[in-house]
């Protein structure tokens, strides 16, 4: 059996039992593009290693690819599609210390201001109000891209300013209050009436100019192009280019900074932020506390104030 057919059957199987299976499906399709349409049994360990480790570094992405391929080949072995797995059994230690791009206020202003001109080009399939509202939602509510693109019309209440996230990671649905500015932007962006029939859910909130659902890759490529057009680049000394998902990280970091500056008890506020972001564990939220120097500085200042107060009472 060819690799493409085996992947298609494997994805169909997992989705038929109720799994969304989006991440593994995307990784396996990337593997298919890397290898080409070859016989499943002809793929060697060297080919797999080249896909896993293009830059000779073991990263969290390496682990995700490894897991997806390992499960795929285990499935193939149990069904007699392949005799053995070419995926390396040993899992090296992760060497990546990834620091996301935390957007400054100026960068956010440039990105939002540049949307209208950028999306006015003839080849752009996403209308400017739609793309601007999507960026505002990702930053203003800290949503994951998949959560935003899966929103349906009935899940966004523009009257009360509430957004219901059903298609969430870890299947943790949550309701989020949003401010009037974001609510207004979403109202302006409501998907246009389709100009031609499309095989799509009729209640999709974000849609392209023809009424079709927005593909993840189209949105990502549009954002990369917007960053280049508006001069938003990686920080000096960083190899990581700004990403859409970094809007979510920026939301969390900016919220924590605001709490510190307002004198709030950040440790008591963390569970609320964790719930708002849809994190499975509060430890996932706590990592933001050490993500950028400004947060560490604010935490240090808070500790110094506390320590001096304790000394003064002795």
Model-derived regions: residue spans:
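Conserved catalytic core of the tyrosine transesterase superfamily
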Residues: 1-314
């Amino acid at each position: 059996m060819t690799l493409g057919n085996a992947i298609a059957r494997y994805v169909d199987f997992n989705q038929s039992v109720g799994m969304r299976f989006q991440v593994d499906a995307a990784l396996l399709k990337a593997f298919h593009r890397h290898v080409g349409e070859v016989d499943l049994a002809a793929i060697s360990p060297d080919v797999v290693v080249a896909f896993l480790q293009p830059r000779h570094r073991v990263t969290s992405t390496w682990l995700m690819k490894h897991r997806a391929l390992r499960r795929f080949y285990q499935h193939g072995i149990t069904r007699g599609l392949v005799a053995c797995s070419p995926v390396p059994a040993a899992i090296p230690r992760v060497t990546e210390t990834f620091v996301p791009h935390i957007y400054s206020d100026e960068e956010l202003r440039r990105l939002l201001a540049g949307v209208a001109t950028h999306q006015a080009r003839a080849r752009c399939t996403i209308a400017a109000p739609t793309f601007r509202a999507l960026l505002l939602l990702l930053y203003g509510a800290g949503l994951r891209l998949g959560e935003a693109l899966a929103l349906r019309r009935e899940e966004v209440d523009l009257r009360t300013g509430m957004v219901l996230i059903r298609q969430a990671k870890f299947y943790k649905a949550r309701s989020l209050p949003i401010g009037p500015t974001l609510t207004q932007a979403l109202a302006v962006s409501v998907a246009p009436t389709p100009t031609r029939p499309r095989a799509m859910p009729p209640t999709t909130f974000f849609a392209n100019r023809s009424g079709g659902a927005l593909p993840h890759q189209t949105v990502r490529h549009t954002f990369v192009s917007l960053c280049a057009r508006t001069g938003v680049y990686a920080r000096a000394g960083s190899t990581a280019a700004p990403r859409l998902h970094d809007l979510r990280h920026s939301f969390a970091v900016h919220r924590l900074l605001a709490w510190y500056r307002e004198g709030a008890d950040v440790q008591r506020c963390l569970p609320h932020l964790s719930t708002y972001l849809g994190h499975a564990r509060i430890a996932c939220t706590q990592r933001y506390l050490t993500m950028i120097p400004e947060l560490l500085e604010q935490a240090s200042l808070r500790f110094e104030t506390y320590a001096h107060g304790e000394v003064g009472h002795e």
